[in-house]
């Protein structure tokens, strides 16, 4: 079975098909494709816009002032309508979904990042499709052009996706605005996002959503720099999601920088000063440096500093040499209690557990 992880972002224009409300027949077709891929073994994550449009329709298009508070009102009302629409359609295929409402702060904060990542992986590991939206009802600065485009790129990094699909009402990126120039040509492949590519991206799209082509270019830049292939494609093309998953050439493909895949992610994760030091024994040092293993509690000798789960800390040897920069799965107080113990003892000692490792290999940068 193909275990490729794909994040699919649906803009408001894709879900409404130009109407003032969610287009149920089109959403049904979207769900059919995702259900097919889900059953074929793909791991699919949905990032969905549409809450504000759904709220506006549910309230019968109220006359509201063009303020942040009005958008938050519509988002608060519409979010429940949006998730119900997804839930009912996936239920036809006996597929469960799990809702996450995120803001950029949830991903930039180290501990909340780890919690969000663990939740997403738990959902995927249990064959539940995550459905993610920006938490527009409480976010202020985030309700602006590009929130869910950028969010989808960060989610793709979060779940270590191979691909990100940005589905929109356009065929892809053109060399000029196709709505103004009938001679505009589709750009099928972008090897690198240059100033020229940015200059032809244009402005915002529809008035129902908050995203435009430029925000998709920014999202593609974030994703490809982290080794994630990104495709801008037409959301109304028949079978577009399944065809993309099976490598058909549709829309505009942004080539991922695969050589920088892991390092890019880690640069993004670890741009912070060290909050503490974990000293380990020689066995743990050899396991990390020579066998590419994670750090187990049994290998920890000492913990210095006060830090939260997910903050950046150093791992050093008994001689004091720094060998790793990384994010622990447990805070400093918990590590003090479980250091030197077997992983099987974690839950008995703490009353909870975030897994068998103190720091996962994926959350480490090797310094030496």
From Swiss-Prot:
Domain PUA: 275-353
Protein family according to the UniProt entry: Belongs to the glutamate 5-kinase family.
Organism: Haemophilus influenzae (strain 86-028NP)
Intracellular or extracellular location(s): Cytoplasm
EC annotation from Swiss-Prot or TrEMBL: 2.7.2.11
Binding site for ATP: 9, 168-169, 210-216
Top-level taxon in the UniProt lineage: Bacteria
Phylogenetic placement of the source organism: Bacteria, Pseudomonadati, Pseudomonadota, Gammaproteobacteria, Pasteurellales
Residues that coordinate or bind substrate: 49, 136, 148
Name of the protein described by the UniProt record: Glutamate 5-kinase
Pathway(s) this gene product operates in, as recorded in its UniProt entry: Amino-acid biosynthesis; L-proline biosynthesis; L-glutamate 5-semialdehyde from L-glutamate: step 1/2
InterPro entries per record: AceGlu_kinase-like_sf, Asp/Glu/Uridylate_kinase, G5K_ProB, Glu/AcGlu_kinase, Glu_5kinase, Glu_5kinase/COase_Synthase, Glutamate_5-kinase_CS, PUA
Pfam family, any one: AA_kinase
Major subcellular location class: cytoplasm
Catalytic activity: L-glutamate + ATP = L-glutamyl 5-phosphate + ADP
GO molecular function annotation: ATP binding; glutamate 5-kinase activity; RNA binding
């Amino acid at each position: 079975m193909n275990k490729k992880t794909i994040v699919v972002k649906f803009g408001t224009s894709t879900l409404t098909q130009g109407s003032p409300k969610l287009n149920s027949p089109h959403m049904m077709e979207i769900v059919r494709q995702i259900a097919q891929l889900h059953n074929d073994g793909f791991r699919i994550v949905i990032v969905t816009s549409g809450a504000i449009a759904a709220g506006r329709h549910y309230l019968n298009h109220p006359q509201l002032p063009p303020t942040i508070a009005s958008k938050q009102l519509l988002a608060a009302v519409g979010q429940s309508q949006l998730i119900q629409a997804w839930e009912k359609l996936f239920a036809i295929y006996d597929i469960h979904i799990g809702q996450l409402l995120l803001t950029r702060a949830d991903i930039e904060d180290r501990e909340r990042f780890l919690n969000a990542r663990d939740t997403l992986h738990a959902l995927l590991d249990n064959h539940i499709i995550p459905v993610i939206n920006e938490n527009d009802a409480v976010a202020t600065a985030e309700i602006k052009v590009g929130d869910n485009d950028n969010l989808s790129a960060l989610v793709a990094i979060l779940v270590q996706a191979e691909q990100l699909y940005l589905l929109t009402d356009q065929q892809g990126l053109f060399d000029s605005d196709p709505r103004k120039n009938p001679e505009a040509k589709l750009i099928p492949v972008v090897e690198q996002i240059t100033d020229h590519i940015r200059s032809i991206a244009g402005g915002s799209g529809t008035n129902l959503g908050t995203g435009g082509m430029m925000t998709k270019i920014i999202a593609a830049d974030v994703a490809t720099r982290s080794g994630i292939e990104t495709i801008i494609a037409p959301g109304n093309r028949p079978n577009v999601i399944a065809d993309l998953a099976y490598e058909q050439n549709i829309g505009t493909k942004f080539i991922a920088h695969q050589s920088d895949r892991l390092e890019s992610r880690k640069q993004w994760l670890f741009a912070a000063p060290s909050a503490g030091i974990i000293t380990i024994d020689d066995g743990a040092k050899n396991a990390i440096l020579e066998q590419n293993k994670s750090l187990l509690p049994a290998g920890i000798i000492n913990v210095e500093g006060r830090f939260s789960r997910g903050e950046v800390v150093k791992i050093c040897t008994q001689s004091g040499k720094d060998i790793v920069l990384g994010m622990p799965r447990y805070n400093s107080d918990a590590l003090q209690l479980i250091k030197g113990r077997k992983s099987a003892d974690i839950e008995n000692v703490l009353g909870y557990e975030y897994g068998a490792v103190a720091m996962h290999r994926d959350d480490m940068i090797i310094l030496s």
